[in-house]
């Protein structure tokens, strides 16, 4: 993450309002967000634009959920992407690779 980013993160997780916001985001994922996803699936709604999926290869995402591209193909027809050699914090740990992938996708 880098010393500067780690210091900012450490300060943020000691701010009760930041922690509350983080927990509310997780709570929404189990509640209202999940309700909206079920409604979208029931209605047959899908992502109608090209979708780029990037993920860290030094994280447990694939172990927990399987292939991210396969998962997102349930939600969109035009899915591309790949793993980046990074831990959980892709923007901080692999900024060049992330920038390249985004630039190629948006070109």
Regions found by a protein language model. Give the residues of each.
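Catalytic active-site module of serine/aspartate enzymes centered on a nucleophile-bearing elbow/loop
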Residues: 76-107
């Amino acid at each position: 993450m880098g010393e500067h980013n780690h210091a900012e993160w450490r300060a943020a997780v000691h701010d009760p309002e930041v922690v509350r916001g983080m927990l509310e985001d997780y709570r929404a994922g189990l509640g209202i967000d999940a309700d909206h996803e079920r409604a979208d699936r029931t209605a047959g709604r899908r992502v109608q634009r090209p979708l780029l999926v990037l993920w860290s290869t030094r994280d447990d995402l694939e172990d927990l959920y399987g292939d991210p591209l396969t998962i997102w193909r349930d939600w969109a027809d035009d899915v591309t992407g790949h793993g980046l050699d990074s831990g959980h914090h892709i923007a901080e740990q692999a900024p060049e690779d992330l920038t390249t992938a985004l630039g190629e996708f948006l070109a």
